[in-house]
């Protein structure tokens, strides 16, 4: 928004504080530098990061997110979904977003927090300054929701907000090509993950590859075709049930039906993105 619009809003809403950067001092990619200025200018002790294009699920979104700051909890991981995206790309986005949420929420609930969603996340202000903010990874385009969270989160100080009223939704406007570029950028932060987290995140891909290797082995051994079909059906049903529960909890529609098929696509896509990431580093 233009600065004059923000200043006009600040007169109507005293809680809105406008931070104006006169000179172009942001020499870094991404939004970490302006976020840092906002955090330093914040009056209160609790910081909430949200996407500029995100819409709250209700009028009490902030209240429902902030109520998770109880006891020793200092980091709150929220959820943001996609809306108004038609066609196959919609299912790819939703599946990717859902799987990412299942990973970071599930691991946080099991005592292994490693990231959140930068479009809906909250933390205490003093944590930001304890680790020096984003200064250690300003050179990366991303990192405010994973490298930073990894530095400040523990099993005891981190919680997950699963209340639907605390969710946000985003109208995804990027193209398929832009989405792939963002995923390649995301790989630049992956090397900062703990080895244990990398291993846990790799388990789904490893088990999927082992499953299809098992299916191919059954075919090569000329075992009854019914065994192959039975193995595939069991795998697909279990996967659909798992995604159905997650979709229901997070308010996502129909993605669970296509989860087994989209998973195959992502196995190939992730391999392609890693290769592209390696070529980008060489350049």
Predicted regions and their residues:
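A conserved catalytic-core signature of glycosyltransferases
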Residues: 30, 116-124, 143
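Catalytic donor/gating beta->alpha subdomain of glycosyltransferases that bind UDP-sugars
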Residues: 69, 75-100, 126-129, 133-197
